UniProtKB/Swiss-Prot annotation:
The lineage of its organism: Bacteria, Pseudomonadati, Pseudomonadota, Gammaproteobacteria, Chromatiales. PROSITE patterns: RBFA. It is found in: Cytoplasm. One of several proteins that assist in the late maturation steps of the functional core of the 30S ribosomal subunit. Associates with free 30S ribosomal subunits (but not with 30S subunits that are part of 70S ribosomes or polysomes). Required for efficient processing of 16S rRNA. May interact with the 5'-terminal helix region of 16S rRNA. Gene3D superfamilies: 3.30.300.20. It comes from Nitrosococcus oceani (strain ATCC 19707 / BCRC 17464 / JCM 30415 / NCIMB 11848 / C-107). One of its GO terms (molecular function) is ribosomal small subunit binding. Keywords: Cytoplasm, Ribosome biogenesis. Signal peptide: none annotated. Belongs to the RbfA family. Monomer. Binds 30S ribosomal subunits, but not 50S ribosomal subunits or 70S ribosomes. NCBIfam families: rbfA. This is Ribosome-binding factor A.
Length: 127
């Protein structure tokens, strides 16, 4: 059983690398700019893959860019079939990866809490 999961992980890493190359070399849609593939999760049967992506640019454009990628999934699957030797290329689904934004918010909250604590200590030391 664990062998299936390690194979799925290896296939996911391979798809991540090849999708990144496809975005650089093949995808010419002007609505999609600077796509980063964070990671790819492949189902244990290797039939479906979720590609987690981020975009550089305005946050408002994220949903439109995701829609464009999901519409181009067939084109990208065909491109993968030309580059990767797998019996079946997984069906692609693109999902926005908000982990970077979430990390940024958490970091800001931590910085704010540390600043409050530092301000509180400096107020107590002056008394």
């Amino acid at each position: 059983m664990s062998q299936e999961f390690s194979r799925a992980r290896r296939v996911g890493e391979l798809l991540q690398r090849e999708l990144a190359r496809l975005f650089q070399e093949e995808l010419k849609d002007p609505r999609v700019k600077l796509v980063t593939v964070s990671h790819v999760r492949v189902s244990p049967d290797l039939r479906q893959a979720k590609a987690y992506v981020t975009f550089l640019g305005k946050e408002e454009d994220t949903q439109e860019q995701l829609a464009v990628l999901n519409k181009a999934a067939g084109f990208l699957q065909h491109g993968l079939s030309q580059r990767v030797e797998l019996r079946v290329i997984p069906r692609l689904q693109f999902v926005y990866d908000d982990s970077i934004e979430r990390g940024r918010r958490l970091s800001a909250l931590i910085d704010k809490a540390v600043q409050k604590e530092t301000d509180g200590e400096s107020d107590n030391s002056t008394e």
